A protein has these predicted regions:
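An acidic-aromatic loop/edge-strand motif
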Residues: 1-16, 20, 72-73, 79, ...
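Aromatic-lined ligand-binding clefts that engage carbohydrates, nucleic acids, or primary amines
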Residues: 4, 28, 36-64, 98-102
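Generic marker of residues within folded, mature protein domains
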Residues: 24-26, 39-41, 50, 74-76, ...
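Short hydrophobic beta-strand segments in globular cytosolic domains
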Residues: 67-68
Length: 125
């Protein structure tokens, strides 16, 4: 989306040069926004959002509406997926906006990792 800096979601946030003012790896909240064109074929189907690796706590909004939360999970715990039913909030056949807030501030000794995978939508059979 306009006004946002693109970053690689397959690498830890702290490995991409975003340091705090003192030069240390950033620790705190990260915001991610994704625009997704959801195919009209999804109409009437259950739609799940899956982020295979997100460290350490995450909240999700779809088209400006709160969708849910994945509670804090230590960074070393795997799998670290965030999977949520977003069916009532998605508009199939249109562009949709997904926002994820990731909090990495619960452990000051841990640098911000954030999303480390490509997210995807699917419809269970």
């Amino acid at each position: 989306p306009a006004g946002w800096t693109p970053i690689d979601t397959t690498r830890p946030f702290y490995r991409q040069g975003y340091d705090d003012p003192r030069g240390y790896p950033y620790v705190g909240h990260l915001w991610y926004r994704f625009q997704l064109d959801v195919p009209a074929a999804f109409q009437g189907k259950k739609i799940m959002l899956c982020v295979p690796v997100v460290v350490t706590e995450a909240w999700c909004w779809v088209n400006g509406q709160y969708a849910g939360h994945r509670p804090y999970q230590e960074a070393y715990v795997r799998p670290a997926e965030f999977e949520i039913d977003i069916t009532p909030l998605v508009r199939p056949g249109q562009m949709n906006l997904i926002a994820l807030r990731v909090d990495t501030s619960l452990s000051p000794a841990q640098a911000a990792e954030g999303i480390q995978s490509r997210m995807f939508l699917y419809s269970p059979k």
